[in-house]
Amino acid sequence: LVAALAGMVYSLLLAFASINLKADQTIGGTALNLLATAIAVVIAKYFSESGSAKLNYANRPFLFSIGGLELSIFVPLGIILLIISYVVLYKTRFGLRLRACGEHPQAADSVGINVYKMRYAGVVISGALGAIGGMAYIVPPVQTWNFEVGVAGAGFLAMAVMIFGQWKPFNIFGAAMFFAVFKSLANIADSTFLAQLHWSSNIYNMMPFVASMIILAFTSKNSMAPKAEGIPYDKGSR
């Protein structure tokens, strides 16, 4: 909950820059991404007894067992959020209005939809979900996390997953599972037949990013992105 709230508050900076100031979303997002790492390091050092950017977890939180199989609570949570996202986007008035503001904002405005409010809502919700995803990435696998290391480009990989999934919830889920297979190879390489290859774990860590570049090179031309994606809305333009 705290992570989601923090993500919502931080996403307001991007919303203000891109919606009110009409700044380039890519530049603004990259700047905030770099700033977030620095803020995380400062906060971690403030709360750390050793003064380092590492935080230790006494227990491995957010884990539960089913028949001896240890799972993260974020697994069922992710499935629930996937279903909720689909229902909200395609079966509710709010979702239809939100999609309209991404496809044809001028047309949405002409029927009385406040495009600015809807885009703010979209950014804030995305900030909350992104923060939950970041927490899922750093908490369950380890007992110590170094904030100076960061998440090794996982956020940019998530953007590739979104593009590969054509901005549709269930397609994105399938794309995420595809890239997760490559991501998991680095974790199991030493304990499976892959160990006989004697490859560095860095090679397996590279695979999701290499795969994303190859796939996007062939699929980006058929992208079904919202028509107004990345375009600042000007109420005076028609």
Regions found by a protein language model. Name each.
Residues 36-91, 195-203, 230-238:
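Transmembrane helix-bundle core of multi-pass membrane transporters
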Residues 85, 103-117, 190-238:
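Cytosolic-side transmembrane-helix boundaries in multi-pass membrane proteins
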Residues 37-41, 75-87, 126-134, 158-164, ...:
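Hydrophobic core segments of alpha-helical transmembrane domains in multi-pass membrane transport
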Residues 1-37, 80:
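Alpha-helical transmembrane segments within multi-pass membrane transporters and channels
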Residues 9-12, 16-21, 42-46, 87-91, ...:
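Membrane-interface helix caps of multi-pass small-molecule transporters
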Residues 3, 140, 145-209:
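Transmembrane alpha-helical segments in multi-pass inner-membrane proteins
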Residues 29-45, 162-172:
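Hydrophobic alpha-helical membrane-insertion segments
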Residues 69-145, 169, 174:
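Helix-loop-helix "hairpin" substructures at the membrane interface of multi-pass membrane proteins
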